[in-house]
Amino acid sequence: MPGIDKLPIEETLEDSPQTRSLLGVFEEDATAISNYMNQLYQAMHRIYDAQNELSAATHLTSKLLKEYEKQRFPLGGDDEVMSSTLQQFSKVIDELSSCHAVLSTQLADAMMFPITQFKERDLKEILTLKEVFQIASNDHDAAINRYSRLSKKRENDKVKYEVTEDVYTSRKKQHQTMMHYFCALNTLQYKKKIALLEPLLGYMQAQISFFKMGSENLNEQLEEFLANIGTSVQNVRREMDSDIETMQQTIEDLEVASDPLYVPDPDPTKFPVNRNLTRKAGYLNARNKTGLVSSTWDRQFYFTQGGNLMSQARGDVAGGLAMDIDNCSVMAVDCEDRRYCFQITSFDGKKSSILQAESKKDHEEWICTINNISKQIYLSENPEETAARVNQSALEAVTPSPSFQQRHESLRPAAGQSRPPTARTSSSGSLGSESTNLAALSLDSLVAPDTPIQFDIISPVCEDQPGQAKAFGQGGRRTNPFGESGGSTKSETEDSILHQLFIVRFLGSMEVKSDDHPDVVYETMRQILAARAIHNIFRMTESHLLVTCDCLKLIDPQTQVTRLTFPLPCVVLYATHQENKRLFGFVLRTSSGRSESNLSSVCYIFESNNEGEKICDSVGLAKQIALHAELDRRASEKQKEIERVKEKQQKELNKQKQIEKDLEEQSRLIAASSRPNQASSEGQFVVLSSSQSEESDLGEGGKKRESEA
C-alpha cells in the first residue's frame, strides 16, 4: 500500500495557518469517509436483513410442506404420492434453512460487526474531538484577545495575573486537544482501510462456507429425486394441455348448440313441450309474503325427488323440502301482473306455493311434471307411457281458471235441455250442492233443495252510497248473499275497542232455511266441500278477516280494500267444523228484497290457518262487548232521561218559589199602605206617591186572583 498521509503533531503548539489548512483537508476527508461508510453500512445491512428473511422464509416453507398432509382439501386431499413427495422436499428445504441460518450468523459476526464498530466508535470519536477542539480554539483566541488589550499606563498586577493565567490554561487545553485530534485523524487513515476490507472479507468467507455446506448436502440421491420430480411435472403438464384442448372443443360445441337457449322464451316449434316428464329441475321465482300487502320473489333452484319438491338457494350445500307434491293440485294463476305463474296446493290444503317459471315452455312442463307426480305416476314401471295417458288432465291445469261468469255460462244447461230431477245447477261461480248424490241423510229442513252455491267473491260491495246493495242468485231473486247494506262514509271500526285480524280463504256461501242450530253450518260445509270436489274447484280467494265490535270485514290483502262487510248484529250463528278445526262458518240474517220483514239467512264458509275456534271465540267476544256496550248505552240514556225529569221538576219548583216570594212582597206593600189610614184618625197625614198607589192596587188585584183560585 502507498504511504499514509499524516498531520504534523509537533506543529500543533505553533498552530500556523499552514497547519490549519492541512487540518481542513483531513477534516474534509473524514467527512467523505463518514458519508461513504454510512452508505456501505446500509447496503451491507440490507444483505444481512435479506439473508435473515430468506432464512425465515425457507424455514416457514419447510414447515408448511410438513403440514400438507394435515390439510383437508375438498378435492385431491388423499393423494399419498403428493404427500410423500412434499415431505421429501420439506426435509431438503429444512436442511437448506439450517445452512441459511448459519450464513446469517456468519454475516452478523464477520461483516456487520466490523463496519458497525467503525461507524459507531471511530467516526463518532472524530466528531467529538472536532467539537472539543473548536471550543478550545475559540477559548484560546478570546484569552489572547484579552491579554492583548492590557493597558500599558495603568498596570494592574491582579488583572495581569488573571489574564496571563487564562492564556496559559486555554493554550495548554488547545495544544493537548489539538494533538489528540491530529492523532485521531492520522489513525483514521488506517482504520478506514480496515473498515472497508474486513467486512468484505467476512462476507466472502461466509458465502464460501455456505456453498461448501450446500455442496456437501447435494448428493446423488437428491439429484435422482429432483430428476424424477422434473419428469413427473412434465407429464402433468402434458396431461393438462390435453385436457385444456378437450375442454375448449367442448365449449365450442356447447356454444353452437346452446345459442337458441339463450333466449328466455325459446321458439316452441324448435323446443316442444315434453308433457310426459316425471322429473324436472330448474330455477323458479318463489313468492314470499313479507307483510299484509307486500311480498317478495326469491329465485331458487327447484327439483323433484320422488314425490317431493325440493328447493336449494345459491350457496347452499344441499336442497331442502319445499312441499310434498303427492296428491297435490297444480294450476296456472295470475299473480301480481307476472307471467308464467302457477300455484301448487298440498293434498290437505294446508300449504300452497306460487311459483314463476322463466318461459312458457318451462311453465307448461313444470305443471305437467307436478301433475304427473301428484298422481304417483313415477311409481309405475314405465312412467313416461303412464304420463302420456294423463296428458289431457295436465293440459287442463295449464290453462288459467276462468272467471265465475265464464264458468257459469260454460256449464249452464242449454235451453230446452232436460236434466234429472236430482241434479242442481253446476258452475264454478254458482253450483248446485247435489246433496242427494253426496250425502246419505237429507237435511232439506236446514238447506233448501236447488240452492245455488257461491264460490267466488266477485267484487266488493260499494259502501259509499247509503242503501245500495248488490243482487246475486238466479231466477230474479233480488237478494244480497253477502249481507251488505248501505251506510255512512264514516268508518265503523274507528272507535271499536276490539281489532283482531285473521287470514282466511273463502270456500263458498249459500242460503239456508234455518239459523238457530250449528247443524246448519255443518251441513253447509259438507255440501260446499262436496261440490268443490265434484267440480275440481281448488282455487280459493284469500282475504284478511277483521273482527271488531261493530262488524266483520273481508279485506283484500294486496290493496287493503274492503271486499265485504258483515254487520255484527246480523251474525246470528257461528261454529267450527267438528273434526277439521281449520274450517269455520257463520250465518248472516239479512233482509231479502225491498221488504224489511222478509228475512233470509246466508251461511258463509271459510278456511283458516288452524284458527277456526279462535275466530269463533273472537266473534263471540265481539258480540259480548257489543251487548255490554248496548246495555251501557241504554243505561246512560235512561240516566240522562231521569236527569232531564229532575231538572224540569227543579225548574217548576224554583218558579213556584218565585211566585210565593212575589206574593209575600205584595202582601207587605198592602200592609204598609193601611198604616196612613190609622195615622189620619190621630190628626197625622201620610202622602202616598202614585207608584205606591199602583202597587197597592196590584196587590189587591193579586189577592183577589188568589182568593178566586
From Swiss-Prot:
Compositional bias ranges of the Polar residues kind: 674-693
Record-linked Gene3D superfamilies: Arfaptin homology (AH) domain/BAR domain (1.20.1270.60), Pleckstrin-homology domain (PH domain)/Phosphotyrosine-binding domain (PTB) (2.30.29.30)
Effect of residue 410 to D: Decreased interaction with OCRL
Domain PID: start-end pairs: 496-656
Main location: membrane
GO biological process: adiponectin-activated signaling pathway; cellular response to hepatocyte growth factor stimulus; insulin receptor signaling pathway; maintenance of synapse structure; negative regulation of Fc-gamma receptor signaling pathway involved in phagocytosis; positive regulation of cytokine production involved in inflammatory response; positive regulation of D-glucose import; positive regulation of macropinocytosis
PTM description: Phosphorylation at Ser-410 by PKA severely impairs binding to OCRL.
One Gene Ontology term of the molecular function aspect: identical protein binding
Region (Disordered): 397-434, 467-491, 645-709
Domain free text: Overexpression of an N-terminal domain (residues 1-319) or a C-terminal region (residues 273-709) has a proapoptotic effect. The F&H motif, an approximately 12-13 amino-acid sequence centered around Phe and His residues, is essential for binding to OCRL and INPP5B.
Name this polypeptide is given: DCC-interacting protein 13-alpha
Organism this protein belongs to: Homo sapiens
